[in-house]
């Protein structure tokens, strides 16, 4: 009975340890992030502007000031608002560098309405440094392109070697030892034939060993420097790729905005051309004389009277004018009195010119003048 209870307790401990473990296998490499995982809590990184990113990984939700239903949250320090960064994890491996970088992408966050509709997300880059076991995550980007990015350099980010790789390494090591022993036997056989040569060769071997040791030390130092440089370059290249991806997305958005602006400018040009045509038409209309109804009636009456005068004038033909002149001359000769004087012509000429008189009227006027 006691054994049964001990078995149940041991099984519960094993299940608890499995639930708290964080092992990731990808592309033939295995990573153990269990020491970095928060069982009761969350990781927090703060930007210089007061923005905060809360996160955890290995599909473990967190209880944060922003909520407890997502794997990561973003707190906007300028507005005081919280946004979910995602609820699902996706893994990828950067194998372009000597030391591989494990990338965890948390997706499915809140929807953001910017130049285009997209969902917020987060990237966590784990870079390997076998000598660092106390580092903390560093915030690289906070929602500039719709995602938050964190880089974490630690020894727990290094891939675990598989048994096949270890066996291969051991086999290579044994083969090297056999080759080394074979070479030593040849040297000993040659040394037995000539002691002087043995001693010189031993000295040469010692010198070579010293040189090899110095070279090994230099190589170790160079390897350490290269490892540090590779670690830095790995993180930098990863961030550069992220920025290139973001820049590509932004370039597409900017190109779409550029096309929209070009279309809008063409529409504005068409409106401007139409507006200029309307202005020219208005100017032409303003240059034409404008009359109201009274002015039009007055102008029309004046034109009618002028046409009537022209009609009356045209009805007097040349024969009538010649007859009037002959009558005038005949009457003028009769106006001479006994003293040989002539009646003032001004009294007769205006009547002929201003009035349409007949010869009988002229004779009547002449007789009236003589009576006075």
Swiss-Prot record:
Keyword check for Glycoprotein: yes
Top-level division of the source organism's lineage: Eukaryota
InterPro entries, per the entry: Man6P_isomerase_rcpt-bd_dom_sf, MRH_dom
Protein's name according to its UniProt entry: Putative uncharacterized protein DDB_G0278881
Keyword entries, A-Z: Coiled coil, Disulfide bond, Glycoprotein, Secreted, Signal
Predominant location category: secreted
Organism: Dictyostelium discoideum (Social amoeba)
Chain intervals with Low complexity compositional bias: 206-230
Cellular component per GO, a single term: extracellular region
Glycosylation sites: 18, 59
């Amino acid at each position: 009975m006691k054994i049964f209870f001990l078995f149940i307790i041991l099984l519960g401990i094993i299940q608890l340890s499995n639930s708290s473990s964080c092992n990731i296998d990808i592309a033939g490499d295995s990573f153990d992030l269990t020491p970095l995982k928060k069982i009761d809590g969350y990781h927090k990184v703060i930007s210089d502007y007061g923005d905060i990113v809360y996160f955890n990984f290995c599909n473990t939700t967190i209880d944060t000031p922003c909520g407890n239903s997502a794997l990561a949250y973003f707190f906007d320090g300028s507005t005081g608002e919280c946004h979910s960064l995602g609820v699902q994890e996706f893994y990828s491996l950067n194998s372009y560098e000597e030391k591989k970088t494990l990338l965890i992408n948390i997706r499915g966050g809140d929807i953001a309405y910017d130049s285009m509709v997209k969902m917020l997300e987060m990237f966590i880059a784990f870079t390997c440094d076998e000598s660092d076991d106390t580092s903390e995550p560093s915030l690289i980007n906070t929602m500039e392109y719709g995602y938050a990015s964190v880089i974490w350099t630690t020894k727990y980010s290094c891939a675990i070697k598989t048994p096949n790789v270890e066996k291969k390494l051991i086999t290579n090591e044994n083969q090297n030892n056999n080759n080394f022993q074979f070479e030593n036997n040849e040297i000993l056989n040659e040394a037995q034939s000539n002691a002087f040569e043995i001693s010189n060769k031993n000295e040469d071997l010692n010198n070579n060993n010293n040189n090899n040791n110095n070279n090994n030390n230099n190589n170790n130092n160079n390897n350490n420097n290269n490892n540090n440089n590779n670690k830095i370059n790995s993180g930098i290249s990863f961030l550069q790729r992220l920025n290139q991806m973001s820049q590509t997305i932004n370039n597409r958005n900017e190109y779409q905005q550029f096309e929209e602006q070009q279309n809008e400018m063409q529409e504005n040009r068409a409106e401007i051309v139409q507006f200029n045509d309307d202005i020219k038409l208005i100017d032409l209309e303003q240059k034409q004389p404008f009359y109201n109804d009274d002015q039009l009636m007055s102008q029309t009456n004046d034109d009618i009277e002028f046409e009537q005068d022209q009609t009356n004038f045209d009805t007097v033909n040349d024969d009538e004018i010649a007859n009037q002149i002959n009558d005038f001359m005949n009457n003028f000769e009769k106006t001479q009195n006994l003293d040989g004087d002539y009646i003032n012509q001004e009294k007769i000429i205006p009547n002929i010119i201003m009035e349409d008189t007949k010869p009988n009227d002229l004779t009547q006027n002449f007789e009236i003048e003589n009576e006075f």
